[in-house]
């Protein structure tokens, strides 16, 4: 989090590439906050307009109604006008009674006067004006109702504004809580980043420590990866490379197993040596304790000898003997100390062997992981190889289909005709039976064989009663008819295809027998050297074999 801004109504958070703004719904800078004052001003303006309209309407009504009546009263009754203009100090009720009486007298005088028609017109005019005033009053009443409705709507808007204000306050409190949560989450994120950096440092140090030990294994894995890349590049040799990879891994596992066994033997020998060294150490410890006891005894003896030396000088020889023994004891003590240092060296060797064993176990585990990954990759390669083989088969099938389609188009362009899964060629020139068969074989076909009534009808329709050689002959064995393309000859089914009295094996003047069959609506045997048109038949499998001609 690069930047964060918190206001009373808006929270803004920015990173290196984006910013996020959090604000209560419907409380933008131009939304609900100014709505209440604006609506209030609108209501006040409507109320003022309605009041002014009502005032001026009443004023106009007053002027329109009273002005003609006053003019008429002043013209016809000057006395009564003078009375109105005089000093009258009665009460309001009395004045109203006098005015009513005056109006009644004026109406009676108007009725009695000779200008009754003009008065009637004025009365009609006053009624019309009164109707207009009534309509205006009704309009004003409608406007007043609309104003009341607007005022009620304004009150509702003000109530909604109060609700929005409370909702705004609630959203502000929620925003403050969210801001506190964001600050807390930011602190947690910083802690997580610190822990991540520490973890990365630890991982980096661990990687640096183990990189040297895994260098040899890494080279082996690189070789395996290079072999795998070679496998991916040429899947045709993938099986051989996979077997070599498995042999290599098996050889590596055998070597590692041998090394582990050797390490186990070494550990066993080291354990035995440790046991022996412990026993020697116990023996040396006992000897050291004995030597310490001897030293203490020697010190006691030396103290006694010193005491005796003070008393007599004859003990010098004994002191020298004791000194010699003391030197021997010192030499034995030095020997014991050297043995103790050898024991420490053996302990360090044992610890080194244990460390090497742990490293070997780690390498074995890594090799196992690499072996599993290699096996997984080999399985993937096998799957990819299967997919590739399937794709190659599909491509081969598509290629064969395309090739077949091209051959079909080529045959159609060469006037071959298709019927019931076979292609037939009907020649325009004439050849002998053997020449016609050789031509058909050169085209990958044979002279046509007929195996059904439908095929017979098709050949008859195309040949149109013109003689055409077909692939039936009994050369070699008279009466043993066979199709030249190897199709089995059905004597029973073929009886209906022969002309009446055929085959008759007629001998011609040149001595040649009729050993070949031609089609001219029906079958007939004929001398094979006769020149006829012919019909070739090609199978759609494109694998027609040539038979020997006798």
Curated annotation (Swiss-Prot):
Kupffer cells. Residues 438-538 form the C-type lectin domain. Residues 70-550 are extracellular. Keywords: Disulfide bond, Endocytosis, Glycoprotein, Lectin, Membrane, Receptor, Signal-anchor, Transmembrane, Transmembrane helix. One of its GO terms (cellular component) is plasma membrane. InterPro entries: C-type_lectin-like, C-type_lectin-like/link_sf, C-type_lectin/snaclec_domain, C-type_lectin_CS, CD209-like_CTLD, CTDL_fold. GO terms for biological process: endocytosis; immune response; NK T cell activation; positive regulation of gene expression. Receptor with an affinity for galactose and fucose. Could be involved in endocytosis. This is C-type lectin domain family 4 member F. The gene is Clec4f.
């Amino acid at each position: 989090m690069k930047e964060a801004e918190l206001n009373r109504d808006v929270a803004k958070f920015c990173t290196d590439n984006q910013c996020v703004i959090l604000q209560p719904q419907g409380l933008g800078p131009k939304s609900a906050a100014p709505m209440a004052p604006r609506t209030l001003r609108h209501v006040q303006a409507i109320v003022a307009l309605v009041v002014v309209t009502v005032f001026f309407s009443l004023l106009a009504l007053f002027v329109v109604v009273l002005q003609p009546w006053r003019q008429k009263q002043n013209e016809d009754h000057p006395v009564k006008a003078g009375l109105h203009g005089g000093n009258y100090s009665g009460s309001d009720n009395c004045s109203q009674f006098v005015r009513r009486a005056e109006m009644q007298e004026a109406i009676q005088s108007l009725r009695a006067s000779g200008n009754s028609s003009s008065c009637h017109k004025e009365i009609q005019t006053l009624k019309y004006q009164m109707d207009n005033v009534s309509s205006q009053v009704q309009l004003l009443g409608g406007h007043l109702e609309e104003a009341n409705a607007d005022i009620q709507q304004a009150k509702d808007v003000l109530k909604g504004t109060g609700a929005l204000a409370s909702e705004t306050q609630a959203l502000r409190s929620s925003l403050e809580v969210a801001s506190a949560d964001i600050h807390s989450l930011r602190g947690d994120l910083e802690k997580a980043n610190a822990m991540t950096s520490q973890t990365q440092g630890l991982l980096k140090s661990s990687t640096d420590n183990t990189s040297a030990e895994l260098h040899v294994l890494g080279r082996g894995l690189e070789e395996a990866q290079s072999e795998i890349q070679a496998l991916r590049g040429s899947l045709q040799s993938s099986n051989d490379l996979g077997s070599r990879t498995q042999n290599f891994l098996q050889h590596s596992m055998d070597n590692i197993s041998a090394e582990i066994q050797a390490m186990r033997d070494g550990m066993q020998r080291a354990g035995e040596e440790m046991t022996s060294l412990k026993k020697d150490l116990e023996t040396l410890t006992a000897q050291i304790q004995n030597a310490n006891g001897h030293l203490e005894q020697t010190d006691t003896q030396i103290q006694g000898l010193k005491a005796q030396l003070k008393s007599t000088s004859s003990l010098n020889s004994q002191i020298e003997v004791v000194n010699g023994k003391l030197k021997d004891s010192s030499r034995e003590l030095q020997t014991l100390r050297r043995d103790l240092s050898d024991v420490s060296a053996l302990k360090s060797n044992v610890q080194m062997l244990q460390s090497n064993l742990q490293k070997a176990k780690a390498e074995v585990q890594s090799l196992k992981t690499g072996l599993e990954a290699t096996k997984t990759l080999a399985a993937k390669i096998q799957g990819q190889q299967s997919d590739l083989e399937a794709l190659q088969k599909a491509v081969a099938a598509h290629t064969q289909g395309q090739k077949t389609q091209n051959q079909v188009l080529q045959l159609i362009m060469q006037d071959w005709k298709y019927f019931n899964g076979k292609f037939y060629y009907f020649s325009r020139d004439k050849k002998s039976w053997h020449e016609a068969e050789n031509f058909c074989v050169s085209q990958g076909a044979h002279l046509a064989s007929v195996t059904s009534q439908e095929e017979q009808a098709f050949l008859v329709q195309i040949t149109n009663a013109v003689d055409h050689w077909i692939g039936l002959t009994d050369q070699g064995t008279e009466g043993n008819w066979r199709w030249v393309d190897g199709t089995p000859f059905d004597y029973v089914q073929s009886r209906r295809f022969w002309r009446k009295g055929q085959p008759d094996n007629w001998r011609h003047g040149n001595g040649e027998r009729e050993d070949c069959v031609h089609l001219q609506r029906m079958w007939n045997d004929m001398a094979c050297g006769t020149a006829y048109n012919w019909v070739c038949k090609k199978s759609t499998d494109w694998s027609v074999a040539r038979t020997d001609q006798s």
